[in-house]
A protein has these predicted regions:
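Catalytic domains of carbohydrate-active enzymes, especially glycoside hydrolases
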Residues: 37-63, 195-204, 260-264
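Aromatic-lined substrate-binding rim segments of carbohydrate-active enzymes
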Residues: 40-47, 56-98, 155-172, 219-225
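Substrate-binding cleft of secreted/luminal carbohydrate-active enzymes
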Residues: 205-216, 221-222, 227-288
């Protein structure tokens, strides 16, 4: 009996570890354009061999940058990712000034800003369908949520209405992610994410290990309050830049957190051991 329980524990541990890499975020950067098509092919094949089945592309438009458009390096790379067997979740439009604007705007201003940004994402969705013509399983909204800028209940209620309307206009399921600044109690925060998930949206919670903005016991409390269908994103990096500086990070081993019942993803591709070519391209670009 003891041997059976030991084997069962090993299997559960293996299943938890295997799930951790099933979905993987990729954040496109201009520096990535330096990779050849052969390098991309090898990278995506290696990613699939690692057990990843879904690639979540954080954005396909960042301000005025569209990464070459329908015939550019990003579109061609994602075609190769799909050919390697990876399912694609395509990110939409991201405003580079998003976090600055969140801090500047009051309630009515924030609602108007969000409405405009969601409109930009709808436009990007139509461009991707019409011009890029990639096979996808879901859309991803790049604008991350947190309980600092949405601490006020009225802001969360307004956002809920906007997300409901937005998701109904998409032709595939919507995914988004959130992180905690420690402003809402874990149970209240979990209930907020559950409300969003009730719209049919796949919600991902970022574990915050990479930025280290919250102590580990606090992060554990937030993870422990989450319903099982809320996904957990392990941050496979450690931030090396100081607050207020341009973001810099180095690869790090993800740390398990929360129950094994959650869907799992990692952030992000360039910090994984088999994707060193991406990290090197970024460092060689001279950009932060």
């Amino acid at each position: 009996m003891r041997r059976f329980l030991f084997v069962l524990a090993l299997l559960c541990a293996f299943a938890s570890t295997a799930r951790a890499d099933e979905s993987l975020f990729y954040q496109p950067l201009n520096a990535d354009a330096s990779l050849s098509q052969e390098q991309w092919r090898q990278l995506w094949q290696a990613t699939a061999r690692q057990g990843v089945h879904t690639l979540i592309v954080q954005w396909t438009a960042y301000g005025t940058e569209d990464f070459g458009g329908p015939h550019g390096w990003l579109a061609q790379s994602l075609e190769q990712a799909h050919a390697a067997g990876l399912q694609l979740v395509l990110g939409l439009y991201m405003d580079p000034a998003y976090y600055q604007r969140l801090s500047e705007l009051d309630g009515p201003g924030l609602e108007s800003y969000w409405q405009y940004q969601l409109g930009r994402s709808l436009t990007q969705q139509r461009i991707l369908r019409r011009d890029w013509q990639l096979t996808l399983t879901a859309w991803y909204m790049p604008m991350e949520l947190d309980d600092l800028h949405f601490l006020d209940a009225s802001r969360r209620q307004s956002l809920q209405r906007q997300l409901k309307d937005f998701s109904r206009q998409l032709d595939a399921p919507l995914q988004l992610s959130a992180f905690s600044a420690g402003k809402l109690a874990p149970a209240v925060y979990a209930a907020w994410l559950e409300d969003i998930a009730s719209l049919g949206i796949q919600v991902w919670w970022q574990d915050g290990a990479g930025t280290g903005s919250l102590p580990a016991p606090v992060r554990e409390a937030y993870a422990g309050a989450l319903p099982c269908h809320i996904g957990v994103v392990g941050e496979a990096f450690r931030q090396t830049s100081a607050p207020g500086q341009a973001f810099q990070a180095k690869p790090a081993k993800p740390q398990p957190i929360g129950s094994a019942c959650h869907p799992r993803a990692l952030f992000e591709l360039r910090y994984r051991p088999w994707a060193a070519v991406l990290l090197e391209a970024h460092r060689n670009s001279g950009h932060p």
